[in-house]
Amino acid sequence: DVYKRQGTNPEQLFGIGYSACFIGAMQLAGAKLGIPVPREVAVDAEVSLGKTDGGATYALGVNLHISLPGLPAEQQRQLVETAHQTCPYSGAIRGNIDVEFSIA
């Protein structure tokens, strides 16, 4: 059965790459905005694979769970919005994959 295979699947690999890239984009955004990014910054990408409305094709969805401990909510929002505009992964999938953010 294809679902019982061991190892990493493509969705997990995409999530790992997106998470790492988004952390880098937040660090660049922090430097640009003058907002210090905490050392404990974390991004966990939850990538889902599902059928489209018609059921004929598959599509990805992403929820980035972002932890920026110690920063005020407004600074967290600014970092995430700016990073989303500059992150290469965000740019590559813009308009094709829905991305949601959960900021803690």
Region roles according to the model:
Residues 2-3:
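Short, small-residue-biased leader/transition segments that mark boundaries at the very start
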Residues 6-20, 24-104:
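Short, polar/acidic, helix-capping and beta-turn segments at strand->helix junctions
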